Amino acid sequence: MQQAAVEQNAEAFVIGGYVRDLMLKRLNKDIDIVTSGDGPALANRTAELLNVKRVSIFANFGTAHFVYKGSEVEFVSARKESYRATSRKPDVEKGSLEDDQMRRDFTVNAMALSLQEDSFGELVDPFNGLLDLENKILRTPLEPAITYSDDPLRMMRAVRFASQLNFTIEEKSLHAIKENAARLEIVSVERTMVEFNKILLSKKPSVGMKLLFDTELLHQFFPEMVKLHGVEKRNNNAHK
């Protein structure tokens, strides 16, 4: 990958969840690569060098993907994103590494590791994600109200990570989730349920369920469950 980037006169970095889990010593087979050059072109050349036969190109998103030794490797060009109020699908334009880190959901997912020969393995962490990781804090790179309003699915992801990793959602961020809970309506039910299922499958689903209730996210996609709050069962009879 380093060789492919040099050939294209570009820089490449590992970014996101793989870096986070590497620091936490957790297994992660999803590897995200961001480049200052052309993401699909870097993917194609890297695949050639690794003798990978199949590369999936997603031209509309400017991304590419292949599987190597059981790991899913995705390539994307560094970019900026802007959102419209009615959609969580962003308008995209070319950007810098820091622009790309800024668009990430949480500081712990915005850390990057350099793949350049002269700085290989160097951590690029403009938002102090490593400190938040050590303190088990979920914080957004941008103002949380902007982060969650732009892409409301990130609110579900915040709860999921809190439940999976036993992290605490930073107070300002938690308040922004409560304020923006109704924005979840622009997210498809399918995407919301994927995150909900991951919360239920986490080690401490009770943590996630309490957060979903307290932030009123649960009210948006599962109001029937909210109505059960306060129901007691005595002698096989339910009481409200």
Describe the residue ranges of each PLM region.
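Catalytic cores of the polymerase beta-like nucleotidyltransferase superfamily
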Residues: 1-240
